[in-house]
């Protein structure tokens, strides 16, 4: 061994890959023997079609150690300049309570959980999201709120389409106030363009002059002014116009709520409730509406129900509205929400309580009033005499001088043509106000000079008719957790109710619940990334620009694409952006008539829902008995729609968990007919390093960074869905109203140019630490793990789809339908019984009803895979006891699952099976038990008796 060979052998650069990937070499050998493969390479050769295997490795820098990655990323972050930003425009500095920072944002018990589709093991975050909904409902005075949307601008676009669905006007025009945040207007315009809505803009006072189905106004306006909307909304309703109001939660602690003015929908951002600006995200957008619009409201809604014992329980309500069920007829294509950020905002409200929030609001307003008084006294004109936290100054020819003077002092202001905007926030101090006064007046004015006059009429800048008199956050939960001890214990109590990756494997097919490593998460709380305003001057954001550029280059190397947009905030939003790029490409080529989108019957529900959002005609392509796209049916559909064919949306490997042999033929057939190929990146975890969309023949894809590239699921968000394209589509990527680039500025899909920018370091860190070898190894091990699980379960459960050589990709589908026919036990019974064994359920009934889809990922080691397989085999044996008549169909551990501590302590046990079988079916559960906190939740009761707020429901539940 040479000196250099020894040095290389002792290097720690490859250590991270070994820690991320679960099975070590010895475990791999055991697994390979079990599946009758001589090596991992032989398995891959039997699994991935040879004609799509990459001829050479990905071009990525060598892997970095954790320490080296953090050092290099810190150097990038340090290039961001953190000035005092008074830009406002929907983004504000705030103080994240440290108790929330440490116990939620930095806690894998909160950030590694999945969306709470399994309510029995999700009661903690369901309760927190219910608190969030109650907070939004109270502050807006509306009857119903959802559990978050992707951002404020997305919420505005969704409000527009809600008004269209729910309204009775025959108009196809929508009014947008000219005092709305410009980034919101951009996203609304994009949505309107593709569904045939005409946008009319003007002052809010002009609304009555127009025949429109809906209107979007802002309160307070983007320039800070406050208008009483009561009469305006009343006149709109007289003309069958629904009115959506964009508002600010902190302002609503002092201002009359939009609901009290008659608003039909209220939207906004919960960012300033304890969530860092993060250069634009992620943040929880909110939406509240009237109860009568509940069936047409987009997004997830948490509701109250009861469990099998009649005890109160929580669940996601009205799921039949969602895209995975209604597909192209869904109210929205939204899948991921912003659960983690919504929870942070809810905890912020709990920690401060109503009095604490009002105190913060009063302080911000008081400092704004002092600033306004000092400026007025110095002869500077304000554009409006009404304000909460934002004032706009008529600075005329001095605008540039004042702006540059502020920049020289390390201060960012909002610049208009001949005006300057100043927005104060929770972090603003008296000394900050005095510094601002000095910049504009040239004098060292003291705030104390103006406080006495302002205190005498504290709310003079708020019109009397707009001052809040109603109470909010009166529920005990907002009034009991104001000490850090109380808060810490409450958050821990909720966390302990939930199942996350801290407990065990989450084998959800198509969801890729892999490791979210601590080193990847560390940078997101650095102030260099968290404290930057998304509209700060470009010379202050060089760190983010470099991060975005490097990550885009990495993703291009991984995918075979030529350009990336990091703007989309979720996979579904990425689909939407990618389809817009395709349609704009066709329009550019004079092919505006091309609007047919071919979608296999096995596709994710977001695919047809996204296609519907750009007014495409969805044509379904069948699948053959092996789960592949039926090429003959595809040829028929292409020929029928050849002249109008826009694209095909495929997933690879397919949602059936196999690498389709004919994928290149599919791409060629579509291209030959003038169409584009959209490859859904949901299953990219089975491609990285082995093949890629560009090499296969795709034109555009979104990547779920919260799947393949390690951004955690957060209990239901955040997610990110950047889109990659081949060069011919690059000019049609999303842009932004604040963009410094000239490309793609025709439309935007998110409020901020880089979407949820502050979580980009997670994916960057993952790729940097894994390197080419580690990433490729991860893909191979994801395939090995899945095939091992499949082979262990195959003697006990039918496996629905396999490739030509009997292998599967990174996930497999087991068929429960024959067992249900023979025993009466359903896939839901199996899923709930797995909870008693200490596991989260696999994906139920997708893409095939009556099945379970299992994806172990590369991060789980052999011991955990065996624990899961042993549980599934034991459950199959339990089903056999039902089949054989030993246990009645209505009294067995599967139909009563999951079991709780209350079951264990029941005075009389009258069931056909023992308590031990119910609660401690394995040695592992006897040694370390995860307890569901409720029995099986009654979904039907929850939807028939819809309650989406915090107050006790004892009076609603009948015996």
Curated annotation (Swiss-Prot):
Record's keyword terms, sorted: Oxidoreductase, Pyridoxal phosphate
Modification sites for N6-(pyridoxal phosphate)lysine: 707
Q: What class of enzyme is it?
A: oxidoreductase
What is the catalytic activity of this protein? N(6)-[(R)-lipoyl]-L-lysyl-[glycine-cleavage complex H protein] + glycine + H(+) = N(6)-[(R)-S(8)-aminomethyldihydrolipoyl]-L-lysyl-[glycine-cleavage complex H protein] + CO2
Q: Which GO terms describe its molecular function?
A: glycine binding; glycine dehydrogenase (decarboxylating) activity; pyridoxal phosphate binding
- EC number(s) per entry: 1.4.4.2
Pfam families, alphabetized: GcvP2_C, GDC-P
Q: Cross-referenced CDD domains, in alphabetical order?
A: GDC-P (cd00613)
Name the coenzymes or cofactors required. pyridoxal 5'-phosphate
- Give me the Gene Ontology terms describing cellular component: cytosol; glycine cleavage complex
Query: From its record, what is one biological process in GO terms?
Result: glycine decarboxylation via glycine cleavage system
Could you say which protein family the record assigns here? Belongs to the GcvP family.
Subunit text: The glycine cleavage system is composed of four proteins: P, T, L and H.
Summarize the protein's role.
The glycine cleavage system catalyzes the degradation of glycine. The P protein binds the alpha-amino group of glycine through its pyridoxal phosphate cofactor; CO(2) is released and the remaining methylamine moiety is then transferred to the lipoamide cofactor of the H protein.
Q: What is this protein called?
A: Glycine dehydrogenase (decarboxylating)
Which organism does this sequence originate in?
Photobacterium profundum (strain SS9)
